[in-house]
Amino acid sequence: MFSSEGKFRKTYRHQFNQLRTGDETEIPMSTLASRIETRKIPLTNGQIHAIKEAPDELVDIDGFQKIVTSKAAQRSTIKRIMYDMADPIMSDSQKIEVHSYIDSYSWCPPPIFMLLITIIQVGIFFFYWESDGGRSIWTDCAGCFVHHNHTAPGIFIFAPKLRGEAWRFTSYMFLHAGLNHLLGNVIIQLLVGIPLEVAHKIWRIGPIYLLAVTSGSLLQYAIDPNSLLVGASAGVYALIFAHVANVILNWHEMPLRWIRVLVLFVFIFLDFGGAIHRRFYTNDCDSVSHLAHIAGAVTGLFFGYVVLYNVVEHRIEKIIRYVCLFLYSAFFATTIIFVIVRQPYSKNLWNNENCS
């Protein structure tokens, strides 16, 4: 996790101390560039140019760090684009470490995980839709079944009777019940997931997404071991609720935090409020797996709190992190136990009589 003494901040603090003279806490900008040259401070041409163009008369350690990690100090167009993708979900204090991490990238185009997952999902959908021979692209569950009479599940779909084929607990994320379903998921996961992956790295966002998908099928089977499952909604919900975790983790450093909370609250209210209304008031037989959504939300919030970057970690936040890790581990373990002990086509724990 990033801290107030992250490795990049330590480097910039050391450089600033090398540039100081005597007991200075602020350095005159008029002398800063010449000091960098004479004292052989290893800054890039872009960073030196940004220092020369800075309007301030004096600069302290915080100002120095912001200048050398600013967009103006970055000459690479690709990396400036990456800054723009990451900045909306970061606090100002996160940007120093994240921009520095982006500067250290030696490959492109990032972020590879969300792009790769999306390409595979789109490719599989159109491959199976083409082989289905003329079925409606908007409603065809492409690849879900070997035959159109729905008697033989495809190799990716999660089917309760095939729970022994463990890959199905995750592979169902590659299938979608029509183009509308596919577009809804891939658009959101690209808009939400790419900034998260740029800011928080592939080895943080990848596990959140994949654990959410797996948790979605585990919870679905635990509650309703009669239903087939397709779609990446659990992973998408994990990305959305990882934003919630990010805001909570960096609450004091996060700009526009109340606006972020309001937007997320409205989304949650509309989605889950609609599901509750359909379940208890209209008695509609809803085919959407809200259980997978819930599992994704739990993963994004609790596991996200554990693994996402924290700019300044306070003692209480460290305690909360361990509590979240315990709660999520208990949730995950409980669903696994249910999968082991409950047989396919057992009675639903939450049954809607209209859907029997």
From Swiss-Prot:
Which reactions appear under catalytic activity for this entry? Cleaves type-1 transmembrane domains using a catalytic dyad composed of serine and histidine that are contributed by different transmembrane domains
Coiled coil: which residue ranges? none
Report whether NAD shows up as a keyword of the record: no
For the null mutant, the annotation states: RNAi-mediated knockdown does not affect vulva development. Partially suppresses ectopic vulva formation in a let-60 (n1046) gain-of-function mutant background.
Chief subcellular location: membrane
Q: Which GO terms describe its molecular function?
A: serine-type endopeptidase activity
Q: Where is the active site?
A: 233 (nucleophile), 293
Q: Which InterPro entries match?
A: Peptidase_S54_rhomboid_dom, Peptidase_S54_rhomboid_met, Rhomboid-like_sf, Rhomboid_IM_Serine_Proteases
Task: Return the EC number.
Answer: 3.4.21.105
Functional note:
Serine protease which activates lin-3 isoform a in the proximal vulva precursor cells (VPC) during vulva development to transmit the inductive anchor cell signal to the distal VPCs.
Question: Which family does the UniProt entry place this protein in?
Answer: Belongs to the peptidase S54 family.
> What name appears for this protein in its UniProt entry?
Rhomboid-related protein 1
Source organism per entry reads: Caenorhabditis elegans
